[in-house]
Every structure is written in structure tokens, then in C-alpha cells.
Amino acid sequence: MSKLFDSRLADVIRKPVITEKATNALDLNQYTFEVDHRAAKPQIKAAIEALFSVKVIGVNTMNPPRRTRRVGKFSGKRSQVKKAIVRLAEGDKIQLFPES
């Protein structure tokens, strides 16, 4: 792949989601990431495979509703987020936590 294509794929994945539910899903070889809200499932799959050198079996996405935040009398909305749950092939693993 070209470097330009790789840099665009790197912009698709924002950060891993570390919650109790996401950590429990690691046992099922499922990893949860926050991704760009414009990204489609094939783009997310290509980005994960290129960045982590793993084989992706399936991608599930969700667009949770935007949350309203208040600061004093001013009300606003948080930025749009999209979550992707990525299922990897048997034997593949992504190192999210450093080994100690």
C-alpha cells in the first residue's frame, strides 16, 4: 500500500474503547474502537488489517446519540462518535495493554 493510503487509514481509527464491557469482549476476540463517524465498515476493516497486521472476520458499528452538555446557562452537544466492534480471526491478537 502507498504511504498516502496508509495515512488515511490511520485517520479512520481514533482510539480503543476501554470499558468493562469492551474488556470482557476481549475473551471473545472482539476489540472495540472509536472511529471516524464518516467511516464505513470496509474502511474500518482495511484500517485494522493494515495497522495491526491481523485478519478481521467481522465489523459491527454503532452510532450512539450525541450527548448534551451544559456549562452554566449554555447548552451544547458533544462531537459525534462512532464505535466499531471488530472480530478477529482465531489466533490473531491486538496488543492494547503493554506487557509488564
Swiss-Prot record:
Membrane-spanning segments: none
Claim: Acetylation is one of the keywords in the record? no
Q: Which GO terms describe its molecular function?
A: rRNA binding; structural constituent of ribosome
| One Pfam assignment | Ribosomal_L23
InterPro entries linked to this entry: Nucleotide-bd_a/b_plait_sf (IPR012677), Ribosomal_uL23-like (IPR013025), Ribosomal_uL23/eL15/eS24_sf (IPR012678), Ribosomal_uL23_CS (IPR001014)
A Gene Ontology BP annotation from the UniProt entry? translation
Q: Which domain of life is it from?
A: Bacteria
Keywords in alphabetical order, please.
Ribonucleoprotein, Ribosomal protein, RNA-binding, rRNA-binding
How it assembles, according to the record, is: Part of the 50S ribosomal subunit. Contacts protein L29, and trigger factor when it is bound to the ribosome.
The Swiss-Prot or TrEMBL record describes its family as follows: Belongs to the universal ribosomal protein uL23 family.
The record's function comment reads: One of the early assembly proteins it binds 23S rRNA. One of the proteins that surrounds the polypeptide exit tunnel on the outside of the ribosome. Forms the main docking site for trigger factor binding to the ribosome.
Q: What is this protein called?
A: Large ribosomal subunit protein uL23
What is the scientific name of the source organism? Prochlorococcus marinus (strain MIT 9312)
The gene from which this protein is expressed is rplW
